[in-house]
Amino acid sequence: MKTNLLNITFLNFKSKLTLLISFGLLLLTLISCNKKAEETPAAEAKPAETTETAQVAPANPPANFKHATATVNGIKIHYVIGGQGDPLVLVHGFGQNWYMWNRLLPELSKHFTVIAPDLRGVGESDKPESGYDKKTMASDIHELVNQLGYKSINLAGHDIGLMVAYAYAAQYGDSVKKVALMDALLPGIEPVWSSVKASAWWFGFFGWPASGDIVKGKEKEFLTNFWPVVGHVKDPFTAEESAEFIRAYATEGGTTDAFKWFGAFDQDGKDNVIFAKKKLKMPLLAMGGEYFAAAFLKDHSKLVAENVSESKIAGSGHWLVQENTAQVQKDLLAFFLAK
């Protein structure tokens, strides 16, 4: 890896000052919400306007998809499934749920049977006390795939989902045809990991055991302040997407347990160092946003895989699917359909 990549901050489009300001705004928002609650007389107190009052039911996928659940590793995993052809499993990341893929489902389902789960810890999936290391979370997905009767799959993961997808491919490589890693990086894989960890303040905050309790009940304020920090396009989500993502994290335990994905990074790093001793052999697409992970993801992926190709999503920050839907769809289809 080139020397100049060692100093990439993972947010080279944002200065450290901008990150600190964003963090400060987040904390001020939380403090303001707490203060207003304390100052409101009991007789005038009103129920908070949460997504659970505004949107009780989960969002629906396209008409040719359905909601379903499966019990895997002793917990319930929710997923949507639809389409025809070979299976393609799509794994979401933090700040979103299965619905992050909704724009892509109509076209992808013309070519694949698409399965998009909610990871353990968020949305309609269970939220157990433990099991948030990516090795275990990958096992959840593998058990789901087995229950559905598939012997091999195509696989894509974004953000935390990238980490889960890698852990899946590393453990069950013989059953993965192709894998797309989208706009994040792998804990423990150096030299990039240490540089990113030092500059991405949310890694520490989210991994702090009390963080979920701080954000609980303020999911809308939290997410709407966080999304722009790692994005590039202004307001990339539709109102429906924002409402669904907020609702998914406002479910009981949603933020508390999703933050455990970050709390498991130390264990993930240990697991990844072991996984990386045997490089992935299946084709791997490193897909990064022009203003986010594209700066390093291809070289980073080559540390763990032998057959790496690249997709740089033009004009995009971290939220690839929403910031440049057309190119993401085009490049994923080109990769997964190529013989």
Regions found by a protein language model. Give the residues of each.
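Short regulatory "switch" loops immediately downstream of catalytic or recognition motifs
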Residues: 1-2, 267
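Flexible "cap/lid" subdomain of the alpha/beta-hydrolase fold that forms the substrate-access gate
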Residues: 55-68, 74-77, 84-87, 115, ...
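Conserved HGGG/HGGXW glycine-rich cap/lid loop of the alpha/beta-hydrolase fold
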Residues: 75, 81-124
